[in-house]
Structures are given as C-alpha cells and as structure tokens.
Swiss-Prot record:
The keyword Cell membrane applies. The keyword Membrane applies. Involved in the control of energetic metabolism and significantly contribute to cell fitness, especially under respiratory growth conditions. Pfam families: RGI1. It is found in: Cell membrane. It is a peripheral membrane protein. One of its GO terms (biological process) is energy reserve metabolic process. This is Respiratory growth induced protein 1.
Amino acid sequence: MTKKDKKPKVATITTKSGETLKVFEDLAQFEDFLKHETEDDDDFDNVHCQLKYYPPFVLHEAHDDPEKIKDTANSHSKKYVRHLHQHVEKHLLKEIKEALQLPDLKFKDKSKDEDFEKIVWNYGDTGEFHDRKFRISISVTCKHDDAMVDLDYKTVPLTEESVI
C-alpha cells in the first residue's frame, strides 16, 4: 500500500476586491504559518486567511477517519457545540497567541451569533509587535450540516488616527 502524499493543504486565492487570501485545511499548518508570518514577514499586521478543518476532538472520536464522523456532530448538537466552544477558548485561541508570540492577547471583544443554520463566535483584540499596533479578528463558524469548522483570521494595521 502506498502512503498518501503529504502535500501542503493550503491555497492562495484572490478575491474580487483584489485581496489575497490563504485558505488552510490543516490546523498545524495554519499555526505554523502564523508563527513564521510574525517572524519573517513585514505584513504580519495585514493578514487574512481562513481555515477549514475538523476539530481535534471530532477526529479523535472518529479515530482520525473523517469518513467515520457522526452525522450528529454539527451546530444542532449541544455536546458538539459545548466541546467546540471549549476547544476554541482553551486551545485554539491559546495556540494562536503562542504562534504570534503575543501572550498578552486576551480576545476580550467576544460575541456569539446563533441561528438555525450556524453558530458564529467572534473574537477580537489589539496587539503590538515590532512597535506596530494592529487589530486581530477571529471568527469561528460551525454549521448545521456537518462537523467542519470555518475559521476566519484577519489582522489590520492600526494607525495613530484609528487608535484615538
């Protein structure tokens, strides 16, 4: 039996507005990208990327086989929503802070939007790195039809005028 190719699961797309957007399918690659973005790139304060992935607790329950994920793992399941929220609050945001090397980020601007189709958690904060201030926004979405989670990560530079 041959092994599957471990190609990077990332795509770069350009939106209609001309914005470049990186789309990841793997949580570890997303975190590595954030870490290297802050170390290497001058545009760390102006990044937009998305991540579409199965949360680790879902894959663990399905023995790392996406085909075995239960149909009930979606936004209509209280257990799934509770575990996803814990994953986001206790692991994902913490790992993003570590990848960015900004332990002071608190993501205190929190909100939750819920309807029949989906649940969206929004997190935001401001940070400073290399004497440059920026706003970070993270949106985590789970839908009613499957266990896949969509994460939207965006940083925007703050100018002196926008801070006031």
